[in-house]
Amino acid sequence: MSMTVTTSSNVSDAAMLSRLALQIKSWGKALGFAQIGICDTDLTAEEAKLQTWLDKGFHGEMAYMETHGMMRARPHELHSGTVRVISARMDYLPPEAGFATNLASPNMGYISRYAGGRDYHKLIRARLKKLGDQINSELVALGFDAADFRPFVDSAPVLERPLAEKAGIGWTGKHSLILNHDAGSWFFLGELLINLPLPVDIPVQEGCHSCVACITSCPTGAIVEPYTVDARRCISYLTIELQGAIPEEFRPLMGNRIYGCDDCQLVCPVNRAAPLTQESDFHIRPKLKQPELLTLFTWSETEFLKQTEGSAIRRIGHQRWLRNIAVALGNAPSSADIISALEQRKAQADVDEMVKEHIDWALAQQRAGDLQTNNRKTERLVRVIQKGLPRDA
């Protein structure tokens, strides 16, 4: 339902909307969002970029990126009547992140820090719903009809990063993530699509300048040019989105990263002063904090489902979990214990052929016995973290 004015003139309506926009930002912070921004729905400039990216096949097996076509760049088609997008930022950097400790320990599994706690999708969507309800309560109290709104997170076909940039949340870094001068890139985004003509915010100035740290540090060279990521090369894609076999050329480069990758964020100088999350739900679960690869590899499917309940990790399923860990074990220092664990897991009936192929690769790597426990990029990354992010090292 569109907003219907019952008492105010257009001038007073504009003033009311300005006041409401300020209230929305205040309500958002009370709900746990670190920042709220507002923008219009025009993403025309992004359509050509999206189509080029898709045409080059950079989305890999993420067919859903292509299925929804340009709807991603047209919020008003995603939710009819939408004239504004309220973009919300929620910080997730956990305390005692232990980045360097984890990456420097090849017998431990590295899990991207966004996934160490509770799955953010339901949490953020619920908070956005509360924000929409507060907006409508205020509108009704002022004598207006309730607005029509719909909350989204990144599981929906919406270009959240360009919207966040338009809404003044930050600028697009060369790694394609949104960067904020105060918060770096350690945050989730959510959107509230609404048919309320609120005043929009001003985008911030780009701040990367000549820095290319993210590009040069990517383990697999996935940032093929500034602002462009070939997902097919990205460790996050390979360990989370890819359903089949991980190409052999990338396996040695993955190191101990078993779910996602944070390297491009860890070297970014904008992240040096990033705040810790205020959400305890995003703190790393004890059994996912500096976890031993051999321990994780013994988890049955039942144990996997139990330990990942309410976590984003659960979506990859037990077989891909084993696939990723097998690769990490193949990259670990040669060990009789690892070889034994790989052989035992391969012999189990619940292991599919895809996982067995990765186990065979890992066994060959282990038996070669001349592995480098850390490649040069990882060693350099650890030094960068220790120097630039001492609190989180």
Curated annotation (Swiss-Prot):
[4Fe-4S] cluster 1 binds at residues 208, 211, 214, 268. GO terms for cellular component: cytoplasm. Pathway: tRNA modification; tRNA-queuosine biosynthesis. GO terms for molecular function: 4 iron, 4 sulfur cluster binding; epoxyqueuosine reductase activity; metal ion binding. It catalyses: epoxyqueuosine(34) in tRNA + AH2 = queuosine(34) in tRNA + A + H2O. Residues 196-228 form the 4Fe-4S ferredoxin-type domain. Its EC number is 1.17.99.6. It comes from the Bacteria. It is found in: Cytoplasm. Binds 2 [4Fe-4S] clusters per monomer. Its cofactor is cob(II)alamin; [4Fe-4S] cluster. GO terms for biological process: queuosine biosynthetic process; tRNA modification. [4Fe-4S] cluster 2 binds at residues 218, 234, 261, 264. It is an enzyme of class 1 (oxidoreductase). The active site is at 154 (proton donor). Keywords: 4Fe-4S, Cytoplasm, Iron, Iron-sulfur, Metal-binding, Oxidoreductase, Queuosine biosynthesis, tRNA processing. Monomer. Belongs to the QueG family. Catalyzes the conversion of epoxyqueuosine (oQ) to queuosine (Q), which is a hypermodified base found in the wobble positions of tRNA(Asp), tRNA(Asn), tRNA(His) and tRNA(Tyr). This is Epoxyqueuosine reductase. It comes from Shewanella oneidensis (strain ATCC 700550 / JCM 31522 / CIP 106686 / LMG 19005 / NCIMB 14063 / MR-1).
